[in-house]
Each structure stands twice: as structure tokens, then as C-alpha cells.
Design a protein with these regions (language model features):
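Short, glycine-/small-residue-enriched flexible loop/hinge segments at domain edges that mediate gating
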Residues: 267, 288-301
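Short, surface-exposed connector motifs at secondary-structure boundaries
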Residues: 22-23, 287-292, 318-320
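Bergerat-fold GHKL ATPase/HATPase_c domain
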Residues: 1-105, 114-121, 238-282, 321-345
Length: 345
């Protein structure tokens, strides 16, 4: 008789409950070939252990919530906030603790030093599978701050949506004398889910779904009149290692030379067509040597965009290596067409 791994069964059930599956009993029976009574015993024990709780006619993961409210009066230090309030809730394996220490202090530093906020709050939503942390400030708003910086430093008037796009590559900062602009980039890559919301605009590398917006915790903060919300989520049992994420994009001997761009997220509508869009993308990536362009969700691109990026861009910036991934046939054909046409001229 096959011995069932009880921890594996439990985690399987928890995953189904988290995803909202109503048929978790049948699915577990089919997956592990165990009886219905055995599944109910697992569920009952998890309820006793405080991992799940009843919600009308089904179960949900039990979430513990903690809130902290801070005055940004010039005395705050992100490390002190983490050690005093946050670390007591982050008691996992060393790799996860390290990720939270890095991510939280990076994002809290942004709120303290760049937001011009009077008040900063931290909310923690924790269940047996994941931990989510919100950092919310009532300041100028991250995208409006970028917009103001571009106007004052370059005399460029850009939309808030364009301000979002400047964050994808990494290295962008409104205070080069103090910061490298790497915090958001690496935090967004090491987290399972990373979202910045401000003034009705989102920055995220994730496949942002309406269900995330409809999440009660996130939606309640979307009603704020000004400021910035940073949402970070990672599995309590994540296998990610912070140093490996850094080494992927910033090898020790070379520095931060690699980046990846989710093209669909970078441009309004997700299907870039113009030369000006390509030029803006090039401006973001020219500081890197190795660039991966992720075309997930992009259904088509314009001839002008493709020519400006893959032909003229390569001529103007010969040091950059452009690699594409997850291209559909339409996009792939357009890229090949402009490159091949250029080669015979």
C-alpha cells in the first residue's frame, strides 16, 4: 500500500482553498487516492490548528492582520522600523527572512526619503502560505514625483503612464547623488507579487488580474486621494535566494549590466507600434549590455517600432545585446522582416 505524505496532502488542500476551489475534497481524493473521510479529517485538523476558517459554506485561509502607523517626522529609520515592528512576524527560513529584510527596508526608505509624506503606515496580512506587506504613504505619489523630476531636470512633460514605464529597466532614480535606482527593480524580481499603486496607475511585473484589484485589502487603499501604496507578497516557504536574484542581473565582476523588460506592461495598450515608443524603450535600456525583452501578452508590434528598436537601435548602441522571449508568430515575423529588409539594403 502506498504511503501518503501527509504534509504534501495538507499543502495541496491549502493551495486549493487559497485559489478558491470549491471542489477541493474531490480534487484531493482524485490526486492522492484517499477516502472522503480522510480529506475531511485533514480539513478539520487544519481548522483546529488555526490554518483555515469557515466562511459561509466553504473554507478560507485564516489571515492574521497587523497595522502600524508612523509619523514621518525626520527621525524614522527603515532598519529600526523593520527590527521593531516587522521582524517579529517574519520568522521563516533564512532565505525568506533575508528577502523580507532587503525588500522592506528598500521600499520603506523610498517612503521616508522620497514621498514627502507626513504619515506612513504598514499593514501585514499573513496566512500559513504567504505573507503580504503594504507600505502606504500620503505623499506626492511616486509617479507624480517622477513626472515633476522629468519636467524640472529635462524639461520633458510626460504622462503618469510613461512614468510607470521608466521603472521597468532599473537604474532610474530621481536622486542619483543618493540612490542607484535598483531597489524597485530587484524587489520586484525577488517577490512573488509586487505592485505599486499611485494616482490610478500600477507598476507590476506580474500578470495583473482584476481579482487582485478586487482584493478587499488592496481595493480599500485604492480609494486614497494621494500618496503611494507598495504591495509585496512572497511564499512563507519560498526557495528564492536573494543573492541569486542579484547575480542573475548584476554579476559580481560586471555589475548591474542585465535587465528584463515586460513589453506589454511598459506601453499603454500593450502593443507598441511607433518609433517614439521604441526610442523611449532604448533610453531606458542603453545603460545595460544584456537586455531580455519579454513579449508575453503582446499580440503585434508596428513596423516603425521594430525597425527603430532592432535595426537603428542596434546601430546606434552596438554594445547592447537584445534578446526576445515569448514572442507570438506575428511579433516574431515583424522582427525578422525589418532585420532581413535592412540586411539587403
Amino acid at each position: 500500500m502506498k504511503i501518503v505524505n501527509q504534509e504534501k496532502v495538507k499543502n495541496y488542500i491549502l493551495g486549493l482553498i487559497k485559489s478558491g476551489r470549491k471542489d477541493y475534497v474531490k480534487a484531493t481524493i482524485d490526486c492522492f487516492n484517499i477516502s472522503k473521510s480522510s480529506v475531511y479529517n485533514y480539513v478539520k485538523q487544519m481548522e483546529i490548528d488555526g490554518l483555515i476558517e469557515k466562511n459561509q459554506n466553504t473554507y478560507i485561509l485564516k489571515t492574521n492582520t497587523y497595522h502600524y502607523f508612523l509619523k514621518n517626522d525626520g527621525t524614522l529609520g527603515e532598519d529600526r522600523i523593520y527590527n521593531q515592528f516587522i521582524s517579529q512576524h517574519i520568522q521563516f527560513k533564512k532565505n525568506v527572512n533575508s528577502i523580507w529584510n532587503y525588500a522592506f527596508t528598500e521600499m520603506m526608505n523610498n517612503a521616508i526619503e522620497h514621498s514627502e509624506a507626513d504619515n506612513i503606515s504598514v499593514s501585514i496580512y499573513q496566512n500559513c502560505l504567504d505573507t503580504k506587506i503594504f507600505i502606504i504613504d500620503d505623499g506626492i505619489g511616486i509617479f507624480k514625483n517622477i513626472q515633476r523630476f522629468m519636467k524640472e531636470s529635462k524639461n520633458e512633460t510626460i504622462s503618469l503612464r510613461e512614468c510607470v514605464s521608466l521603472l521597468f529597466a532599473g537604474k532610474f532614480t530621481t536622486a542619483k547623488q543618493y540612490h542607484t535606482g535598483e531597489g524597485i527593480f530587484f524587489t520586484s524580481h525577488v517577490m512573488d507579487e509586487f505592485i505599486i499603486y499611485s494616482d490610478d496607475n500600477f507598476f507590476t511585473r506580474n500578470n495583473f488580474k482584476s481579482s487582485q484589484v478586487e482584493d478587499g485589502n488592496l481595493h480599500s487603499f485604492m480609494q486614497m486621494e494621494k500618496g503611494t501604496l507598495v504591495s509585496m507578497t512572497i511564499s512563507n516557504n519560498s526557495k528564492k535566494i536573494l543573492s541569486e536574484v542579484f547575480n542573475t542581473f548584476a554579476p559580481v565582476d560586471e555589475g548591474f549590466i542585465k535587465t528584463t523588460i515586460p513589453v506589454a506592461h511598459m506601453f499603454a495598450g500593450g502593443n507598441p507600434v511607433s518609433r517614439s515608443e521604441a526610442r523611449r524603450l532604448l533610453e531606458c535600456i542603453v545603460l545595460f549590455n544584456d537586455i531580455v525583452l519579454d513579449f508575453s501578452g503582446v499580440e503585434e508590434i508596428g513596423q516603425g517600432f521594430a525597425h527603430e528598436l532592432f535595426v537603428l537601435g542596434k546601430q546606434k548602441y552596438p554594445h547592447i545585446k537584445l534578446r526576445t522571449i515569448k514572442t507570438c508568430k506575428t511579433v516574431e515575423d515583424m522582427i525578422k522582416r525589418v532585420i532581413n529588409t535592412s540586411a539587403i539594403q
